Amino acid sequence: VEDKPANNVLLVGARGTGKSSGVKAVVNSFFDKGLRLVQLTKEQLIDLPVIMEHLRDFSSKKFIIFLDDLSFEEFEVEYKYLKSAIEGGASAKPENVLIYATSNRRHLIKESYKDRGANDDDMHRSDTLNETISLSDRFGLIIYYMAPNQQEYLDIVDGLLKQHGIELSKEELRVKAGAWEKEHSGRSGRIAQQFVTHYLGQVYNK
């Protein structure tokens, strides 16, 4: 937004740790400065060059092309369009466009045991493997989102509850919020928010 050089960004972390929310919060924070979000699915990556050229015409705006929960199976080739776009391809990426992607794994392309096999008859297997693993390295900035530990999770729940004027004792917070995360998919900001929503529903129904 300040017309300075900036890197494409890959946000890596477990589910519910706030990767997507973080990207959307950035766009909301700088909306008044002309920042806009264009969200694509991986199936739309084939159209990425055309989309970027279209965005180039809106030079007064800045765009984040957002790819949420991105990963590829070994047989999918859409990653080639993304790699080409990041590296410049036939035409340079517009100066008003950056690519942000979120993923649950550091290497975006699933690697099979066959890819590692020494007896594979594909003489270019090593080059192919390096190409797929290196996709994430094409992002200039990689940000890791770590799942919260037990105390951090409880602090998140406590903070969310206090926003609604509710304060639980440390023991009640530990028991109730702890039971909730054990019944669900572990500790994360999303799980904390879901517990608070559930708890508020119980309180308001009384």
What are these regions (language model features)?
Residues 7, 35-36, 60-64, 93-100:
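Loop/turn-to-beta-strand initiation segments
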Residues 1-3:
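Pre-Walker A adenine-sensing motif
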Residues 146-206:
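C-terminal alpha-helical "lid" subdomain
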Residues 120-133, 140-154:
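Conserved AAA+ ATPase "SRH/arginine-finger" region at the nucleotide-binding site
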Residues 29-63, 70-75:
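AAA+/P-loop NTPase substrate/partner-engagement loops
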Residues 57, 74-121:
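Conserved catalytic/switch belt of AAA+ P-loop NTPases
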Residues 19, 48, 74, 107-112, ...:
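Switch/connector loops and helix/strand junctions flanking conserved nucleotide-binding motifs
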Residues 5-24:
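Walker A/P-loop nucleotide-binding motif
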